[in-house]
Amino acid sequence: MGRKVHPIGFRLGYIKDWQSKWFAEGEEYTRQLHEDIELRKLISKELQSAGVSRIEIERSANKIEISVYTAKPGIVIGKRGTNVDTLKSALERKTGKKIKLNIKEIHQPELDAQLVAESIGEQITRRVSYKRAMKQAVQRAMRLGAQGVKVRCSGRLGGAEMSRVHEEAEGRVPRHTLRADIDYAQVHAHTTYGRIGVKVWIYKGEVFPNQVAKSPAEPATTAPTPAPERRERQPRRNSNASA
């Protein structure tokens, strides 16, 4: 089952959270859903070179809070905040509501599946060897602490006559385990030979949502188990002895 479904959608509500957090009913739900899609398209288009990983949207009555996770916050903010102010104004004109924009930095882009997939796709578009781009991405992620990485490219790789699939993997990626923290992304690279699909799985370890971590300052203490009493050995009865 883990091979057939989206790795993040498979874990929603268990160890993963939703990227849109609001509640609505009927036609209002449809309207807000389409509005979220348009907002994400606008932000991704305006911040195409800023390395945006994901966009989280939270709604209240007359306010929308948007959190943008990026590897290059300086490009998003701009000189003296001009870029972020321009983007905020464009979003407010589109929605007619007050927008609160939060810019959050990703400190290790090599461990973010979306950014890794976009990097590989960009290199393939620039005619870099797809094998080299995939292998370097896997090695960088493993060097920074990933427990497993898998990269798959499919299409007319290297301008081949027939499309094929090529994979690079290192470590383990347990896609069936719900508590496994797996980051996943899928992008498309547009080349002169057609479109190349890039998929990335990054396994970062296991997460136990119900486990309570104990404070190191207060280690758990248990009462010592008493040693079992030693019994005296009874003398062996001689069966040959006469009564």
Curated annotation (Swiss-Prot):
Annotated region (Disordered), positions in chain:
212-243
- A Pfam family annotated for this chain is KH_2
Which InterPro entries is this protein grouped with?
KH_dom, KH_dom-like_a/b, KH_dom_type_2, KH_sf_prok-type, Ribosomal_S3_C_sf, Ribosomal_uS3_bac-typ, Ribosomal_uS3_C, Ribosomal_uS3_CS
Domain KH type-2 intervals: 39-107
A GO molecular function term, named singly, is: structural constituent of ribosome
CDD domains referenced in this protein's UniProt entry, alphabetically: KH-II_30S_S3 (cd02412)
Keywords of this entry:
Ribonucleoprotein, Ribosomal protein, RNA-binding, rRNA-binding
Instruction: Name a single GO biological process.
Output: translation
In the UniProt record, does the keyword Ribosomal protein occur?
Answer: yes
| Single GO cellular component term | cytosolic small ribosomal subunit
How does this protein assemble? Part of the 30S ribosomal subunit. Forms a tight complex with proteins S10 and S14.
PANTHER family the record matches: 30S/40S RIBOSOMAL PROTEIN S3, SMALL RIBOSOMAL SUBUNIT PROTEIN US3C
Function, please? Binds the lower part of the 30S subunit head. Binds mRNA in the 70S ribosome, positioning it for translation.
> What family is reported?
Belongs to the universal ribosomal protein uS3 family.
Q: What is this protein called?
A: Small ribosomal subunit protein uS3
Which species does this protein come from?
Chloroflexus aurantiacus (strain ATCC 29366 / DSM 635 / J-10-fl)
Gene that encodes it: rpsC
